[in-house]
């Protein structure tokens, strides 16, 4: 089991790397995260949803994602509550105290999934959540040491040296663990190191002498590693000598599946930027309104920061606008939440750029789809994760067809598009069509390079590169005895 001294210490990345190393060695390996709090999710082979990080880890193992890999998924929709998903299906929206009371049952779900995976695979690499030293969350813990003790897992503790204070993080974490929990830790991994390793060695020697626990390895700071973030919006972009199209998206308070933008963020000729709500909106070819776990709430925040006027000005100057999932719902005239699924029950005015209304329903739509665009000869594959049903004249001009079923909407002038599909930019052919729609096709030289850009192949190459680094920098002789 990989646990971290903090959130974003590198747990997801290390698990993916370990999984790919073992997969390359012929081991039947699977990832597992007992409890995940994240707004980025993926549709599974058994028709549920799990955190996207576990879907990437499944790919590292050569597997399709399955709900047993992440039996408890928490998707925050307010500051004090979240949608609770058990074995891929929505249980309920629960406030924090109500979920705390539910934890014993959640633990049963976690252990049931764990047992099924144990029966199918030779090795399971488990990912913890946050930090194991959260004193207020120790009771009924199912995410970190509580699970490790129940499943009798050895633990690797990973810490991020790039943010500073790595030795304090490690020693402080150990000080807050019980004796039995400390004994589970078989070694430390220092993550995101840049510089001369010789200058770090005295600290590593002190750490091992002080704690009696070995340092299993020091992983370098890996730039341009194209793996989807578990939750935090990734704002760093690779160096791009020449870009021909600018795309922006606002950072919504409850943004979900912002990993839709990763392919654009990494595209060599697209200048993609996430824009904070209070920042000036730069001139752009395309504005994308991303998904949201609280559509009405995020819509109100967008309006309060003047984004209606900002987007209207963008449209007046000929820019394109796209809404994905919750962002699609915002483009309509009204959004109704009669059951209070995402906050207080009621209705809100949308931006009104598409003539449609959306009603949030208790049933969640989860499926992988393949369709054909209506404005280009291109096949689109993606997945749906939403709880809304939209209706209105705008849907009579669909954005794509999934078999005989119409999906999404495209305005009469072709300037505004909306869809429930996530993963729109992951495939080269579809990406070319979307970017041509946004203005890319007007640049002849762009046609020579865009078809060769394949985000899925880039992710696979990143997993291989990550595995190479993990294999090179970790003490596999010591690790092998625990696998």
Curated annotation (Swiss-Prot):
Pfam families assigned to the protein according to its UniProt record, in alphabetical order: CbiA, GATase_3
Associated pathway: Cofactor biosynthesis; adenosylcobalamin biosynthesis
Domain of life the protein comes from: Bacteria
Domain GATase cobBQ-type span(s) in chain numbering: 244-430
Keywords: Cobalamin biosynthesis, Glutamine amidotransferase
Record field: transmembrane: none
GO biological process, alphabetically ordered: cobalamin biosynthetic process
Active site per database record: 325 (nucleophile), 422
Gene Ontology MF terms in the entry: ABC-type vitamin B12 transporter activity; catalytic activity
Family statement drawn from the similarity comment of this UniProt entry: Belongs to the CobB/CobQ family. CobQ subfamily.
PANTHER family: COBYRIC ACID SYNTHASE, DETHIOBIOTIN SYNTHETASE
HAMAP family membership: CobQ (MF_00028)
Function statement: Catalyzes amidations at positions B, D, E, and G on adenosylcobyrinic A,C-diamide. NH(2) groups are provided by glutamine, and one molecule of ATP is hydrogenolyzed for each amidation.
Record-given protein name: Cobyric acid synthase
Gene designation: cobQ
